[in-house]
Amino acid sequence: MWYLLGNFELIMDKELVVLVDQEDRQIGTMEKIEAHATAVLHRAFSVFIINTNQELLLQQRAFDKYHSPGLWTNTCCSHQRDGEKTLEAGSRRLIEEMGIKVPLTELFTFIYKASFDNGLTEHELDHVLIGYGGKDPKINLEEVAAFNWMPLDEIEKDLKQNPQDYTVWFAIIFDRFYNYIKNKKIL
């Protein structure tokens, strides 16, 4: 299926996402771009890699992405494939995007909805994952333009001062992530 985004961008997408209900029970699958075009609730995950200095590994999205190009976001995020376990999906994308292999742990899930300027909407039941490591990534330039290790408290401040530099979902997810790890005294 072909989709027209913005004024001129035409893309074809065959990647499927897992459609879920509010309780994360699978109710079907749909092409990713169609799910984003119609704002259907689907399963996703967000990975946060933290080093011993309590810095988060951020990625700058590649500049040719069909939404949120060039914006900073968490270490990686994507969608589980049909039948794929969440931690396996997180590990797969972490290797594909950042060239990193570390054990991941699921912290929590929540539902959010965020719209983009190009008419697409993320409506996701997001599984938030954490991993620990300090090595610089070997980024996949098709997915990632750059990376940066940034202290968590500085991210919190910068998100307020420069929200235009970050993906819309990162602001939502980071707030929940940071409050969770502070309340649970994880770091």
Residue ranges and their predicted role:
Residues 4-10, 31-33, 70, 82, ...:
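Nudix hydrolase/Nudix homology domain
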